[in-house]
Amino acid sequence: GLNPRTGDRILEIGGVELNNRMLTGNNFHRYINPERDSEEGALAVHGLTTEFLSDKPKFAEIAEEFRAFIAGAELIIHNAPFDIGFLNAEFKRLNLPPVHEQVHGVIDTLVQAKEMHPGKRNSLDALCDRYGVSNAHRKLHGALLDSELLADVYLAMTRGQNSLSMEEEVEVAADGAALEIVP
């Protein structure tokens, strides 16, 4: 789906943890039963069918585990308003606080990329190409794979001439998690 305000739901959440600019191996990945049928347009993007998701946990069943994963973290998200909108809609259904009250902050790599590369394509695939991050194995949009790709892109983006100071870089990465949510 494309819009949580029209009832679209999260189908998959994936996140990887970075600590001192290194992947820790502490990943979060869950498929989620959206309690509704997959839409044709969304199905073409992620390939997750209604049948596949039917026996997966509902968001309410994984919410506390996910909240523990992101608690106090600096989230690194590509096109953050899109993903945060879906997360906040799910949290609101459960009477839980919005994302910004649960995390240290959010870095939007799309905003960063547009500042660093104005007028250029700045999709995750375009950034993978620009920074030499291999995404050849990516056929469909998948939350965990996209999180891993985004972590590599973020590290490449922030080590160049336009990077933050080293102190800021380490502070951001020390408790940061790159997240991608597939609505």
Model-predicted segments: where are they?
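Conserved non-catalytic scaffold segment of RNase H-like nuclease domains
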Residues: 1-103, 114-117, 126-140
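Short catalytic/ligand-gating loop segments at beta-alpha or beta-beta junctions
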Residues: 140-141, 167
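Active-site flanking residues adjacent to catalytic metal/cofactor-binding acidic residues
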Residues: 78, 107, 145
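Active-site phosphate/pyrophosphate-handling residues
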Residues: 85, 122, 148
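Acidic two-metal-ion nuclease catalytic site recognized across multiple nuclease folds
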Residues: 156-183
